[in-house]
């Protein structure tokens, strides 16, 4: 099993190109099931989760071709995928594939919308909280789907097709919004999604669906209106830049010191995180190529943050911020409101010498003057990269184990950091 070895203490200087957003690429790939024409997606990141979803879609009969780089593409330019779901041969998504990634459960929506039936295994993925699919099931039932659970599978049928409805989520749910949005595009009549998630990735998917002929308004607001259409056609769409990757590298620079240009980043996608970084002592400069992050001389200031749905501080940057705050001059407080059990990285950060205490959903981080390298183990995707951030500033050597979590969500992480002066290498086997 691969590991990452890091010798801490180097400041970061240079340019890091930001990849396409995983959290947009996955639902965009799934949305290709809605049409029998080809969907072309540009700037798709090369990630383990993307490769897994290609296998899952292939199981349904989807043909996916990865195109080569075009003239002028950057070295890290995301891949272009040509996705054709002309012939869906199977409406079952098996346990052995779906159990590896929760987002793959979302195939239930386009399969129902287009084929009027689906049998999908209950999902897997990062072990963060329970993440029940109840809200997704509720949304589908509102659209006229008959559902049952049999031997770990959700068996769903809509013999007469989906019918437009008003769906009001009791709490904001990104997964539920994605599922309702995709399903409603081919439903008969009008669908209103109330208390919808406002994340940029939702808007990106809606933009792509509209290019395919959907009639969606209000994406990016709590109220989305979908006028169902009979058919969607092919389209070409570029995946938006990854705001979580952007925030992660910004926090790495704030941790080590130095100055890095985050090329292709879009500041409006993570303004809350940039505001927190400014409070922590980083200098943020917006320019034509993205975002420049620097911390020169000044120490790290403590912050108090509560995670919240967009446009609030993203839960997917909580672990990275906690790593940064281990070196702050004073006590920081981070409250996690999105997922339960999302403090699994605390005990691993403690191995560096971090001082962190937990009280319910709030973590108090008492900054220390130095961290020391240690062998650590990744527990989930975002926690794993928080260990990398800590290691970059720690004295001595750190070995990060179980890095398959990193490969799920960060494209060429060690290459990007190494190019900016970090001493970091992947050790195979």
Swiss-Prot record:
Pathway: Cell wall biogenesis; peptidoglycan biosynthesis. It catalyses: phosphoenolpyruvate + UDP-N-acetyl-alpha-D-glucosamine = UDP-N-acetyl-3-O-(1-carboxyvinyl)-alpha-D-glucosamine + phosphate. One of its GO terms (molecular function) is UDP-N-acetylglucosamine 1-carboxyvinyltransferase activity. Its EC number is 2.5.1.7. The modification 2-(S-cysteinyl)pyruvic acid O-phosphothioketal is found at residue 126. One of its GO terms (biological process) is cell wall organization. Keywords: Cell cycle, Cell division, Cell shape, Cell wall biogenesis/degradation, Cytoplasm, Peptidoglycan synthesis, Pyruvate, Transferase. It comes from the Bacteria. It is found in: Cytoplasm. Coiled coil: none annotated. UDP-N-acetyl-alpha-D-glucosamine binds at residues 102, 131-135, 316, 338. Phosphoenolpyruvate binds at residues 22-23. The active site is at 126 (proton donor). GO terms for cellular component: cytoplasm. It is an enzyme of class 2 (transferase). Cell wall formation. Adds enolpyruvyl to UDP-N-acetylglucosamine. Belongs to the EPSP synthase family. MurA subfamily. This is UDP-N-acetylglucosamine 1-carboxyvinyltransferase. It comes from Rhodopseudomonas palustris (strain HaA2). The gene is murA.
């Amino acid at each position: 099993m691969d590991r990452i070895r890091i010798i801490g203490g180097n400041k970061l200087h240079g340019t890091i190109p930001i990849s396409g957003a995983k959290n947009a690429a996955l639902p965009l790939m799934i949305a290709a099931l809605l049409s029998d024409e080809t969907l072309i997606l540009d700037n798709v990141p090369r990630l383990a989760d993307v490769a897994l979803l290609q296998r899952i879609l292939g199981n349904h009969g989807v043909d996916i071709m990865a195109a080569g780089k075009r003239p002028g593409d950057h070295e890290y330019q995301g891949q272009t995928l040509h996705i054709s779901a002309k012939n869906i041969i199977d409406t079952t998504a098996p346990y052995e594939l779906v159990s590896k990634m929760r987002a793959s459960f979302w195939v239930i929506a386009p399969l129902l919308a287009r084929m009027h039936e689906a049998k999908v295994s209950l999902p897997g993925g990062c072990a963060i909280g329970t993440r029940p699919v109840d809200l997704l099931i509720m949304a589908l039932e509102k659209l006229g789907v008959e559902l049952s659970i049999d031997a770990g599978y959700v068996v769903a049928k809509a013999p007469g097709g989906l019918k437009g409805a008003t769906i009001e989520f009791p709490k904001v749910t990104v997964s539920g919004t994605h599922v309702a949005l995709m399903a409603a595009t081919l439903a008969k009549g009008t669908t209103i999604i109330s208390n919808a998630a406002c994340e940029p990735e939702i808007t990106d998917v809606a933009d792509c669906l509209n290019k395919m002929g959907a009639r969606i308004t209000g994406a990016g607001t709590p109220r989305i209106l979908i006028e169902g259409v009979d058919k969607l056609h092919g389209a070409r769409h570029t995946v938006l830049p990854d705001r979580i990757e952007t925030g992660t590298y910004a926090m790495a620079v704030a941790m080590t010191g130095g100055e890095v240009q985050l090329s292709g980043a879009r500041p409006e996608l993570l303004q809350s995180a940039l505001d927190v970084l400014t409070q922590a002592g980083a200098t943020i400069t917006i320019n034509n190529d993205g975002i420049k992050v620097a911390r020169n001389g000044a120490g790290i200031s403590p912050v108090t943050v509560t995670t919240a749905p967009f446009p609030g501080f993203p839960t997917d940057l909580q672990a990275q911020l906690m790593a940064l705050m281990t070196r702050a001059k004073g006590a920081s407080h981070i409250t996690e409101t999105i997922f339960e059990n999302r403090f699994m990285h605390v005990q691993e950060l403690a191995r560096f010498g971090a001082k962190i205490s937990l009280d319910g959903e709030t973590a108090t981080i008492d900054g220390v003057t130095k961290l020391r390298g240690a062998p650590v183990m990744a527990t989930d995707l975002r926690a794993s990269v928080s260990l990398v951030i800590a290691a970059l500033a720690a004295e001595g050597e750190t070995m990060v184990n179980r890095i398959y979590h990193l490969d799920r969500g960060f494209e060429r992480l060690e290459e990007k950091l190494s190019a900016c002066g970090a001493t970091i290498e992947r050790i195979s086997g």
